[in-house]
Swiss-Prot record:
Belongs to the alphacoronaviruses M protein family. GO terms for cellular component: host cell Golgi membrane; membrane; viral envelope; virion membrane. This is Membrane protein. It is found in: Virion membrane; Host Golgi apparatus membrane. HAMAP family: ALPHA_CORONA_M. It holds the Pfam family CoV_M.
Amino acid sequence: MSNSSVPLLEVYVHLRNWNFSWNLILTLFIVVLQYGHYKYSRLLYGLKMSVLWCLWPLVLALSIFDCFVNFNVDWVFFGFSILMSIITLCLWVMYFVNSFRLWRRVKTFWAFNPETNAIISLQVYGHNYYLPVMAAPTGVTLTLLSGVLLVDGHKIATRVQVGQLPKYVIVATPSTTIVCDRVGRSVNETSQTGWAFYVRAKHGDFSGVASQEGVLSEREKLLHLI
């Protein structure tokens, strides 16, 4: 048996001694990944985002350390370590670039969510609400249930009246801003219940912050370039 091989007995002893600990750690890891969504638990969501944000610098540091260890020792692994370092750095830079491009449109911290590729923006009672989504939808549905406003099933605001449903909804992505106009609705003013459906009408380099008016203001029509 070579010196680099690990005896099966040592592996068995390690698993026997640390089985419960690894079971607990992996179970917690699964819970954080599966239920780490902001609509379920803000605590788990915060832990999940912290893990994702820490992985980039950790992986980059490990790749750089591997380059240092394999330099002038194993040129094959040194080459792979250099390649992994470059790939990790490029992915990390791309994340920050896309996050800042999205942030300049909507001015919300959701732009730095690693899981977010688009943000739905709307305004009710003068307050802007944002909903992060994986991709820009082709249509957006607002549902009002006894004054509770939901966007595609996600609770956004309470004590909303049917007359306050916006005439348009904005969907911002890193590369463009999509304006979705209201094309249909069905409301009941007595029970403050109903729905409104919005589809894509135009897109461009607009601000992703919804205005209080029913149409885009002149300020929002200006190019939002850095």
